């Protein structure tokens, strides 16, 4: 256990695993769009998108629990303790974050949505330092957050304009989703020290996925044309969620929130670059703006973690 702790707290290992998570999440964006097209889910059909997300997360949770059971060579059934911790995490992360996010995205521009989403990592670090107070806010952490968020702004404003309008169901709901993300990050950081982060992740995904599916169906959502390719896409997205969020939870179990959350600023960069490559929009990803954004984010990550790097 000590060796595991030492390994998972090394800055290089944290950086590698966190970036793997961000690459997986980034690859999900173009795949989700492909899934919408194949299953005839309209861009403005929020209810059907929530059904799609619900099925994805339910399957992701089941996959995590199945793989964990195979690894432990016994069937892992969540007990009362796991359920006690999984319910608040699921309400904050899978249900709260994604319910408000999907509705918000449908009522605002992609530019503003991307920028506000970038605030989630900033909010998580602020909550850890100022509200929960399980770590100390320093000028280094603040500077790293500002630089990381600046990188998100740059990557989202490339060749685009930004209006300053604000609506509750648009920008407001996306902001609420990021507050929910911040809360879930803190909860995972605390609860993963008490129970298995893998079982916690699988349980909360399964519960949250079922709730999202029922909410989407209740709103009139449905998946139209279900094909073999569509099923493969849902399985892939479920694997992305299962692997990425479980890795993220394990990292949060062994490290300060700020040390892990700062890598979340890499996520928008991965989304833009991978979407551009897969969708054939190479010029959009590889230009001066994306390089500046990458430099800002990497500098922010270094500033937050450089002390830890010296210790390790």
What kind of region is each of these model predictions?
Residues 2-8, 57, 156-158, 230, ...:
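C-terminal-most transmembrane helix of multi-pass membrane proteins
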Residues 42-93, 123-127, 180-184, 201-219, ...:
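Transmembrane alpha-helices of multi-pass small-molecule transport proteins
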């Amino acid at each position: 256990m000590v060796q595991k702790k030492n390994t998972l707290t090394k800055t290089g290992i944290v950086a590698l695993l966190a970036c793997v998570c961000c690459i997986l999440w980034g690859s999900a964006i173009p795949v989700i769009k492909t899934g919408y097209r194949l299953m005839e889910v309209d861009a403005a059909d929020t209810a059907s998108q929530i059904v799609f997300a619900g099925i994805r997360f339910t399957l992701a949770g089941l996959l995590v629990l199945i793989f964990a059971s195979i690894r432990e060579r016994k069937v892992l059934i969540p007990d009362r303790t796991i359920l006690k911790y999984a319910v608040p995490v699921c309400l904050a992360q899978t249900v709260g974050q994604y319910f408000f996010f999907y509705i918000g995205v449908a009522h605002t521009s992609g530019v503003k949505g991307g920028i506000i989403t970038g605030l989630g990592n900033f909010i998580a670090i602020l909550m850890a330092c100022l509200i929960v107070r399980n770590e100390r806010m320093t000028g280094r952490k603040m500077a790293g957050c500002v630089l990381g968020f600046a990188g998100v702004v740059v990557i989202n404003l490339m060749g685009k304009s930004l209006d300053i309008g604000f609506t509750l169901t648009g920008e407001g709901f996306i902001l609420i989703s990021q507050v929910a993300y911040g809360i879930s990050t803190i909860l995972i950081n605390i609860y993963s020290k008490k129970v298995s982060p893998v079982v916690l992740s699988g349980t909360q995904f399964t519960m949250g996925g079922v709730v999202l599916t029922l909410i989407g169906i209740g709103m009139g959502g449905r998946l139209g044309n279900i094909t073999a390719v569509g099923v493969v896409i849902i399985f892939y997205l479920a694997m992305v969620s299962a692997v990425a969020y479980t890795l993220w939870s394990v990292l949060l179990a062994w490290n300060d929130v700020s040390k892990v959350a700062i890598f979340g600023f890499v996520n928008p960069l991965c989304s833009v670059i991978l979407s551009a490559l897969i969708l054939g929009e190479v010029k959009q990803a590889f230009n001066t703006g994306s390089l500046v954004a990458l430099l800002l984010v990497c500098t922010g990550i270094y500033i937050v973690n450089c002390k830890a790097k010296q210790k390790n």
